[in-house]
């Protein structure tokens, strides 16, 4: 067998560091992540690991990007798995289930993405592309719903002027026009799904809700009605 190239060795070592870092997330949480300890665990001297990740923050960024990409893969695969593309309700429900399933299978990575901010860490712009894959799935469905003329559920109020202005930051991600009312309704759905998943994962649903699966189905089916799918 020919010797591995430098690039192959680097990729293998980078993978080992990230794998150990994810294990450490489960053990101590992101705030206590120790690059030196990870280096020892994978058989490197502490100074050598900085050739791969110059700082703890860069290692955190790599973990965040990897986790967002894994969640993005799960969401996109779930959407693609619905064969009849005009069944927007089934596609939406598949996306919601994929988010929850991934979160429950990867609770520590989910907490890194959507839990308490890590003290002193500011995520760089490089994380936004991966993070945008999840919101992008919702926005694509919103565009298709607009194109099909789906009637939204009865509104409970009008979109506030400040919200209209804030939507200017969303529009660049849209390939076709979508009304402000519909964008806001889909943003509500997005926050509801992640709010439910976070409440469940972080242990805040133990009173009043006994069947988390049934409750999640009820919540997401109500969202289907609200979105007019």
Model segments located where?
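Short, basic, alpha-helical segments at the C-terminal edge of helix-turn-helix-like DNA-binding modules
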Residues: 66-72
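Solvent-exposed, charged amphipathic helical/linker segments at domain boundaries
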Residues: 116-127
